[in-house]
Curated annotation (Swiss-Prot):
HAMAP family: UPF0125_RnfH (MF_00460). PANTHER family: UPF0125 PROTEIN RATB. It comes from Paraburkholderia xenovorans (strain LB400). This is Protein RnfH. Residues 86-110 are annotated as: Disordered. Belongs to the UPF0125 (RnfH) family. InterPro entries: Mopterin_synth/thiamin_S_b (IPR016155), RnfH (IPR005346), RnfH_sf (IPR037021).
């Protein structure tokens, strides 16, 4: 009997999360796991041409071979650049007058 892989496929949209367990033959690829899970039918908004995929937080190509107990993840596009988001949080903290927000300013402007 050939070895089987236990794989989880997960995706989180803004309002719903899905974690789907599938069993695949040894040597299966990330693309095969996505197809077997049916997640692309459940979430038609997923576009694999633009959205990134990975295993346990590490980006992988669709033809990457999976290992037993891997978790395949489909990543949504970022709504805001992380650098811009952090800058906004610091500005908000500065406006509130917190010492924490002022520590990023030059010592002369404190």
């Amino acid at each position: 009997m050939s070895a089987r892989l236990s794989i989880e496929v997960c995706y989180a949209s803004a309002g719903e999360q899905a974690l789907i367990a599938v069993e695949l033959p040894e040597g299966a690829t990330l693309r095969q796991a996505l197809d077997a899970s049916g997640i692309l039918r459940r979430f038609p908004q997923i576009d694999l041409d633009t959205q990134k995929v990975g295993v346990f937080g590490k980006l992988k190509p669709l033809d990457a071979v999976l290992n037993d107990h891997d978790r395949v993840e489909i990543y949504r596009p970022l709504l805001v650049d992380p650098k811009v988001s952090r800058q906004r949080r610091v500005e908000k903290t500065r406006k509130a007058g917190s010492i924490e927000g002022r520590r990023w300013q030059n010592k002369d402007s404190r």
